Amino acid sequence: VRTVRPSAALVTTFANCMLNATSCTISKLAVRTDPSRLRKVECMEKAGATGAGMGTSIQRIRWRIEGIVQGVGFRPFVATIARRAGLVGFCGNDEQGVFIEVEGPPDALAALRSQLFTELPALARIINHSAEHIATLGHEREFTIVPSRHSYSGRALLPPDTALCPDCRREFFDPTNPRYLYPFISCTNCGPRLSIITELPYDRPRTTMAAFPMCTPCEREYTDPTDRRYHAQPISCFDCGPRLSWHDAGGTATATSREEVLALFRRAHALLDDGALLAVKGIGGFHLVCDATNDAACEKLRMRKRRPDKPLAVMAPTVDTAAQLVELTEQEKRFLDSPEAPIVIAPKQRSGPLSNLIAPGLDSFGIMLPYSGIHLLLCDCPLVVTSGNLSGEPVCTDNADALKKLGHIADAFILHDREIHVPVEDSVFIGTAPSRRSRGFAPVPVSITPTDSRSHTGPGPGTSARSTSQPTIFATGGELKNTFAIAHGDLAHVSAHIGDMGSWASQKAFQRAVDQLLSMRDATPELVVCDLHPDYATTAFAERFAAEHDIELLAVQHHFAHALSLLAEHRLLSPNAGRAVVATLDGTGYGTDGSIWGGEVLTLSRSSANWERTWHCPTFPLVGGDRAVTHPWRLALGLTHAWELHDDHLVRNLSNEREVALVKSQLATGVGTVQTSSLGRIFDAAAALLLPRWRGGGAISYEAQATMELEAAATRYVRSHAEALGAVSSETKPVPFQDVIREAVASPDAEQAAFVFHGGVAGVVAKRLVQAAEEAGTDVVGVSGGCANNALLMELLRREVAAEGITLLQHQIVPPGDGGLSLGQAVAGRLLAATGMDV
């Protein structure tokens, strides 16, 4: 096992590591290429064209298109524009993407070329393309879509599941349309993709829709090039599609016709009005649902699911309804109603109809909109819509499994008979910043080629779907909020959210997802990368995988991976680049010294794997290991002891006298303690010191609960004191963390104390970042780690850094927490490969 440690571990340059994009025969384009780039491409193609057919009035071109071009209406789009231009030939799917052969006059071919890259279907993305002139055939009479080919190269990209498009929504509510109120309505521009694909290339027989033969009207649409459902693989209707069914203590009823479906949902609405809990099978998994305005229903859900405090997501019927429940910016409204349709965490409205049990102790919660026909039928008022799973396990996807596991929670079930092949949970964003990347986003790959720009949302120019010059890397991710990643060619394929790895069910789901993505990519890893922590389930998996496949294993320090994930998504890693400074702030990460890190400033080379820990938060002891993490008062005792905050008022009534005495004795001897520099744990300790809620020995019931409640208290202060955000620290040097605590404790009330603490922390971290950046001679400064989910802390930190003339880089594509860790691990693997190790 190799481990990546600071400075001396990896010092070779980045050359030969990040891809130089040489695999494309002629050119590489991003979706919606600008006209100047397109003209350059046309000249390149004309200059490089060879072979029979040149110099004649009729030419034939063979195109290879790679990217998200399967399951998004790309072949029908090509056929339509080719026929419109009077061209003949064919196109089809294979494991690489889409192949096209087209024949006709040069002017018509030029028109096709222009439209091919500027008028793409809504969900399509071209990552790479090549073109060559070949011999004309002369006998074709039309342009056709041909059956898929099997080449087993694994270059086609999997499309994500997306929300209903505007056209399907209009049809859904149109009483004259055959699909009026049809639960499974979709077209080439929307609906399930990843969740139903069993293998590539993407055709109906290779999806879970294969179990539903098309009726004559659906087949007519499917084969009509002018129809929006031309080659739409999920196409179905009341006559031929999946069927809903109702299950409760009274028995089972199947709903086939529109009338039966309406009766089923009337029954569901009646139960919800009475405070019942429903388990509903959606597109990518099950949801547990109840009336969001009903205290008794919300309390029942929390009790049965054993989720006493963790915030619940709410589904609102419309954007306007959502805006009555939470405060939304115009950008957030558009995001909610986008094809990705994520859950958006936003501040609560000051008054509203929702139960206070939605997000106890917090001032914000997640809001979402209906994104499928099933949800449109169900959601006629605000509903709690939370993952249908047992605590600590992945979301249920199988009917029998759900009936077994959720039977003690739900009063009734709405099921359907379309198999969910790949679980896909809802994505979560804090405003427009990623917190959980899943439905609508995964597995859209992340480009890991360098660029001069610092703002990217996905693969861009100069990327290819595969390069033979780079080793394939499998990164197993972290223990919490797990994703894994496969670096394959120029792209990193980060999986959909899997979740916490503590249960056997989660580990089995992880194994299935790994097998599926490796198979879809036709990828054979040459190196496996894991976290440095020896006790993670993902570390054990990586060890077994490396042994079974006889490949080398690399263990990467947690916070180095966080920092790399930020730089990689901004595509700032490149040969001859300078250095970067990244604050990695979270709850826990196994340090190279055996202690628990989580409040670090790292200085990294952007052209090699060299890094160093420039600064860290002052350490203090965790007393009792994991028990300390769940009991903020224990953290507070350890912090005040180590930081010499000798004030009896600070620690008064933290817990009962017996427990406090026991912890103090452990602090005196050091027995049963471990040192930490974690900012997340400092926030937990501060919550116990500043919020009455956390005095008295209470334990958190979900990760980061005390920290989130501290943020909520500080945010309430900001909402009632708008001028508070305008102030920036006047200190020219970082103040000691002890002074931050003292100043916060001296505040007149808990909300102001929480805000003062946030401001003090932001000031200290910002000064350390700027200081490290000056020493490194760089203006590339960023932040990663789970604490970056604290929106108030990030805004204060951004303002502090901006006051020094520096723009703070934050995550835009992958989550700053452990959901983005696998991307950083994969990039670390590429760095190691660049040192010349034989992989």
Name each model-derived stretch.
Residues R2-A8, T12-K28, R32, S36-R39:
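Low-acidity, Ser/Thr- and Arg-rich intrinsically disordered low-complexity segments
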